Amino acid sequence: MPRYLPVQNEAANERVKSVYAEVMRQLGVVPNAIKTLAHSDRILKPVADAYLALNGESGLSEKIRQLVVLKTCRLDKCAYTVARHTELAKSAGWTDDHLKALDDYVGSDLFSFYEKDALRLVELVRSTPDEITNEFWTQLDNHYTSDQVVEMITLVGFYGMINRLALALQIEPDKP
């Protein structure tokens, strides 16, 4: 059970309604995470702006973007974001076989060299970012642009924050 119920549009103040309208315009849905953060409307706006920026124009393919996000959410064991991003990953083209192999991607032939590097980056950023070797960084730079690498790292950081909020606030998965 959620610690705070999502703030519904009818109960929202004008600042919150404005954020909801922008999220709805850009994404077609206002997720429960956004509705729950509306309990603090001064926190809601910057988080929603970051959420929209990371879900808008991207230097990454949607497939890689969702791979990075889903791996982050799975590592954090966040039911809310895993449920949402499993569906988005499938919509982006990942199969059930890929999703089953995600936890043991290193030994899987389902993922390309580039996809495995993105997954490895998620693990390193999430656990020991200061231990990313120059060799691995060069490898990343050989097939991702600096824009793409920065975006992947930002996705890991942002969704790490969202996962912690969702876990602490016990946000329930969105209804399809």
For each feature predicted by the language model, list its residue ranges.
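Hydrophobic alpha-helical segments
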Residues: 1-176
